[in-house]
């Protein structure tokens, strides 16, 4: 055994020397009392030994009691002459190595002693078996042979004890040498394979693995029980001492004392500096707008970053001027895209109209009627104004007067027939006003025929004659205005309401009579919508169902006989989905009366199932069609995957059950619907309800 022992104090010299002498005189016999006493003294000395004391030495148990007093006093005086543990100031990690070593050695020696004792027991058992065989073979042997065999067995036991004592002494010497080498080498680390501690652990593991399995143990002697309790006591005291120590883990268990195993490889190479370029001008690179930019973008020009071309070239784009139309014809729903698209010049230099903003086109009245009203309504002769009552703004180009003059126009001045247009006023107006009122210009397109020109002249003459007849009446101050209105709006106003276009045998109205405007319906017919709302379609469908019920309609049906079912109904013509097929006709009764009829029908085995229960407006009803009335609705069979469905139709405050096509039905297909009865009693009497 090896222990760490503090040098004995003078007060305890007698006790320690007497105990040491007793132990040395008698040697170390293997019995029950001696190991326990030695272990107790050893653990007690270890518990009170300080790891940082310089007077701690390594010694054997047998040498502890044999030290003379002079030697002990010399060691007390000269501490430096002795052999210290490791370094002058031993740390906790170094002393823990010794403690762990003691634990491992104690466990190894216990296992070795157990192995030796078990081997001896096995040897004795084998000899006993041989003796038993000899006794069985030689029944007539005397009792003296048995005594000799027992004597031989008893002689083997002291011999085994002596062998154990020598082996133990040899192990103690080897362990002492290993501990000294460990302390000099600082072999507390198990990381290196050259460490003595590592090699000792490997040897112990190999010895444990090489131990043979013991087949059977009959007895456990008292010394083995003492050694087992010794190991338990040593482990308990060592754990108790560790619980009171300052540190609870060795350097290898403490994560803060371990070497780092993870390293972070961070790329610290400098990156290229990114640059941001701010443009102070509104620049576009070949952008094509489907609509002109808003005014807000023009106001924010030069304040925010805009689109920059990829090649880095900056080309300023001059934004064109857009005229905002304020009249009604520029609405988005009107189909006119003048206010929503940009006019891009074509290669020929002529303006090209783009696709309207909305996919549909709604016909609106002529813009001349919605524009601002002009006082005279007619143009002066020889004026350079490109607009005229005949031309609307959407037909005129928006460039210059030279472009407008490209279109040939023919102006007809009729000064002679215009004389009767002026009424006789009480006070003659001035010459300038009279000249403005006398000048009436009628503008016609080149595509008008020569016959239209003659009709216009005749219309002017006729209007002049009517004007003369009106002037015969007493003229007043307001007659001039009324006359001008009647001249500008004659009888064609009535023709608008009478007919949409020219009737047969009646010539078209002259342009002068309508102030140079034609009706929109002369060129485009009025589009009438034939679409219906969902509510209107449903109402029409319900009216059709009511009409079919009132007519008791049952066409397209045929009665056939089916094997295992009886009679059934087959479609004789195709039926569309949700189309009326037939009505389930019977007696409409209450629930109470239906219960009484069921009891009465239960007595008749031949009575079928013809009672249909349904709910309408939170009230239960029943239609009893048990009585054969010749209606086909009662003959339609059951199927959980039927092609008909029921619907309640209310006619004159009375609910009716009608059968509608659930899907498209082809001719020759059997008509079925789901009865909906899933009760156990019904399935017991009518199993076909499950299919």
Curated annotation (Swiss-Prot):
Gene3D superfamilies in UniProt: SET domain (2.170.270.10)
Disordered as annotated region, ranges: 1-29, 341-363, 382-401, 407-437, 464-516
Keywords linked to the UniProt accession: Cell cycle, Cell division, Chromatin regulator, Chromosome, Methyltransferase, Mitosis, Nucleus, Phosphoprotein, Repressor, S-adenosyl-L-methionine, Transcription, Transcription regulation, Transferase
Modified residues (Phosphothreonine): 252, 344
Keyword match Chaperone: no
Keyword Signal: no
Phosphoserine: residues carrying this PTM: 195, 250, 281, 346, 383, 388, 392
UniProt-listed PANTHER family: N-LYSINE METHYLTRANSFERASE KMT5A (PTHR46167:SF1)
Protein name: Histone-lysine N-methyltransferase Set8
Organism from which the protein derives: Drosophila melanogaster
Lineage of producing organism: Eukaryota, Metazoa, Ecdysozoa, Arthropoda, Hexapoda
